[in-house]
């Protein structure tokens, strides 16, 4: 039967396991890989279930995918001389309530500003004239 415990069973049997998304929305759904990994950590605490340790779950979304596609010597972990994209979180990256604080891609800091963050800043504490005309009173 297909259960979430299967990935824990495969890991226990010595299989290199990785968690990833395979579809046309990879960029938008990348966060789901972290959520699945976090779920597997929680599953390990359920009696009778087989999940992953935190370290194994994190490796399943970082170094193991790189190893599986033959790029483990170049990417997937932070080592001198390797290419790397780095994300700094405000908490546990496998926890849904954690948020990204900083991102570097190929060593270049990335802006985290989006349309949503600009709107939040604009309307959280609106200045004179910031609200659309419909909101004038």
What are these regions (language model features)?
Residues 1-3, 117-122, 135-137:
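Extracytoplasmic and endomembrane cell-envelope/extracellular-matrix remodeling and assembly machinery
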Residues 14, 46-51, 114-118, 130-133:
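Short, surface-exposed, polar/charged, turn-prone segments marking secondary-structure boundaries
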Residues 23-26, 121-132:
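Metal-coordinating catalytic core of metallo-dependent amide/deamination hydrolases
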Residues 18, 27, 74, 95, ...:
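Glutamate identity and glutamate-enriched acidic tracts
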Residues 1-89, 109:
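His/Asp/Glu-enriched, well-ordered alpha-helical/loop segment
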Residues 93, 130-137:
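C-terminal recognition in membrane/secretory proteostasis and scaffolding
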Residues 67, 79-123:
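C-terminal cap of metal-dependent C-N hydrolases
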């Amino acid at each position: 039967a297909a259960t979430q415990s299967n990935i824990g069973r495969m890991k226990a049997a010595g299989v290199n396991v990785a968690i990833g998304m395979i579809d046309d929305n990879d960029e938008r759904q990348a966060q789901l890989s972290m959520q699945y990994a976090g779920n597997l950590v929680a599953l390990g605490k359920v009696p009778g279930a087989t999940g992953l340790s935190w370290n194994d779950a994190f490796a399943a979304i970082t170094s193991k995918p790189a190893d599986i596609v033959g790029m483990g010597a170049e990417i997937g972990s932070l080592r001198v001389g390797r290419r790397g994209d780095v994300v700094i979180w405000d908490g546990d990256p496998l926890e849904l309530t954690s948020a990204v604080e900083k991102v570097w891609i190929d060593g270049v800091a990335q802006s985290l500003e989006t349309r949503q963050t600009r709107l939040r800043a604009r309307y959280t504490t609106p200045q004179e004239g910031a609200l659309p005309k419909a909101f004038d009173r």
